[in-house]
Amino acid sequence: MEKLQNRILQEGHALSETVLKVDSFLNHQVDPDLMYEIGTYFKNYFKEHKITKVFTIESSGIAPAVMTAMQMNLPMVILKKQASKILNGDVYQTTVHSFTKGLDYELTLSKKYIAKEDNILIIDDFLANGEAALGAARLVKEAGAKVAGMGIVIEKSFQPGRKMLEDKGYDVYSLARIAKLQKGLIEFVK
């Protein structure tokens, strides 16, 4: 997605060889027009996949996921990273390691928001090592439902996430694929 790549080049900051800061339009301040366009790209790519729900992991995946769900006229479910007292234990849970934060968390899905016949589209802001996406997929599989695909806003292609997901048979569609990060340098996959 050329517009997204341009925004990354104009406003993104490569803080290191693995960390890209895009907080001016994606994960702190959000550009709703850009998120709408991102939703359009995901809707168009996954339109033949018979999606029944859009899932995302709190919190930075929410904006692109809600725009995708809105355009597909589907419900969106937010997978929780922290235990909630209102879920009352009627949940699916899996442990996920956060690459960004360097810690483990319990990814949680209420059983009432997924059915065996669901065909789930997982949307996330970043793909690096693939741990978050795999965790979301584990919850979907535990419920007996199917992962129809994974929509990623920004993929760090130099990390193993895509290969791990594709090796497990998932259809991964990324809007911006980064080949290399260095302090002050961002290069895309050609």
UniProtKB/Swiss-Prot annotation:
Its EC number is 2.4.2.22. One of its GO terms (cellular component) is cytoplasm. CDD domains: PRTases_typeI. It is found in: Cytoplasm. Keywords: Cytoplasm, Glycosyltransferase, Purine salvage, Transferase. Pathway: Purine metabolism; XMP biosynthesis via salvage pathway; XMP from xanthine: step 1/1. 5-phospho-alpha-D-ribose 1-diphosphate binds at residues 128-132. It is an enzyme of class 2 (transferase). It catalyses: XMP + diphosphate = xanthine + 5-phospho-alpha-D-ribose 1-diphosphate. Xanthine binds at residues 20, 27, 156. NCBIfam families: PRK09219.1, XPRTase. Homodimer. This is Xanthine phosphoribosyltransferase 1. It comes from Clostridium botulinum (strain Hall / ATCC 3502 / NCTC 13319 / Type A). The gene is xpt1.
